[in-house]
Amino acid sequence: MTNKLIIFDTTLRDGEQSPGASMTKDEKIRIAKVLEKMKVDVIEAGFAIASEGDFEAVQAVANIVQNSVICSLARALDKDIDRAGEALKGANASRIHTFIATSNIHMKMKLQMTPDQVVGQAVRAVKRANRYTDNIEFSPEDAGRSDEDFLCYIIEAVIKAGATTINIPDTVGYNIPHQFGATIKSLIERIPNSDKAIFSAHCHNDLGLAVANSLSAVLNGARQVECTINGLGERAGNTSLEELVMAVRTRQDIFDCDTNIDTMHILSASRLASSVTGFIIQPNKAIVGANAFAHEAGIHQDGVLKHRETYEIMRAEDVGWNANQLVLGKHSGRNAFKVRLAKLGVEFNDDGSLNDAFRRFKELADKKHEIFDEDLQALVSETQTESCDEAIKLVSLKVCTETNEKNTATVVLFINDKKKTATANTSGAVDATFSAINSLASIKINLQLYSVSNVTQGTDALGEVNVRLEYNGRIVNGQGVDTDIITASAKAYVHGLNKVLTVTNKAHPQI
């Protein structure tokens, strides 16, 4: 009988630590709903004590999601654990994930505590978490550089205190597969009460080995893996959920376990996370990249046409890919629109949101003859993004360009419900547009990244623009879509500005 491998998704917590990837409460709820549809076992919704916004997001996800365990991170401090417990009150099933550093350098330089003091604090934290839930996870931060004898000592103590999951993090992505797998195996074998807890892996991708290290951990006894959609996360990111899940499922000849993940929702989850965070999926990204199932070489194409398994080890349709099938047109009705979006995993909270999305669909259908699923997802994502309260709204944009002449952009914005207009003349249409917006917003913004991609194929395709803005040390991403690239650019810039005005810095720890 195949053992169950628990999938612990931390896109909403660790994934959010990607530079500029801060999410609003509504964005976290949207991603959490998709994770629930995917049948993710545990959703780490945030770090409840980090900010009021984080607390509200954890609380909202806990109240809405019914079929996944909802988790909040908490340092091994009473105030953190109490805040997490309060945020999780409404959850159908909850978990508190507490942690403390265990490597010599962290204990000495960061915590300024002795090993015995660290053990005592960890035990007290687990016992306090038990006031709120009997589902308690403990992580020895920087376990990859910790002394193994000390790891055995502290893990045995926290299991005895009530920890039910032991998560071994490679916080700085330092380990390599055989080393990390051996650590997991040794801990399970050496700790007397290891059978009372599930062992978990949390790997970072600094050396490009997060998925490989996690798979090695599974082969050596770990039965939970912590991961993020698209491998999002601080620095080089975390273990990629889609890669880990499909590796285990594809190689059942090697792994004696499998996940409960409904892989049909992998692609939609990937695109949603990309849209919300502004982190574009590279074309050659395994499983979800545009080229993941493409075959250029003639010999490969011939082989696939004759028999798929000659060059494909997975079916594209099993992770949500289709053939860019034309699904709707300008004569399609509201109900057909709603039904198609439901099949794509998109739901609306009220008729007003549906009507707004349908209006935008009709506007798009007048500009673009062929409407694909990717168009619908991009359109709805923008609709839901703009449904949030915004201090700045784009009313109109007029751009005049001429070869070898400066470009002129006239922008009309609503700023705090006041209509304002500005014109700028510069060497480029995008630069002129951004300059005009900046003059109206009256804040100095540093543009760190500007990228354009097409949502589908064709000259009339929707263009998706992503910008990364920096303001007073804060980094945010903004997204915009339109059949006109300059308009999409303006939308993305305004979206980023609104995030600058609302997103606050949060003290997220590393694990």
Swiss-Prot record:
Residues 5-267 form the Pyruvate carboxyltransferase domain. GO terms for biological process: L-leucine biosynthetic process. Its cofactor is Mn(2+). Pathway: Amino-acid biosynthesis; L-leucine biosynthesis; L-leucine from 3-methyl-2-oxobutanoate: step 1/4. SMART domains: LeuA_dimer. Its EC number is 2.3.3.13. NCBIfam families: leuA_bact (TIGR00973), PRK00915.1-3 (NF002086), PRK00915.1-4 (NF002087). This is 2-isopropylmalate synthase. It comes from Vesicomyosocius okutanii subsp. Calyptogena okutanii (strain HA). The lineage of its organism: Bacteria, Pseudomonadati, Pseudomonadota, Gammaproteobacteria, Candidatus Pseudothioglobaceae.
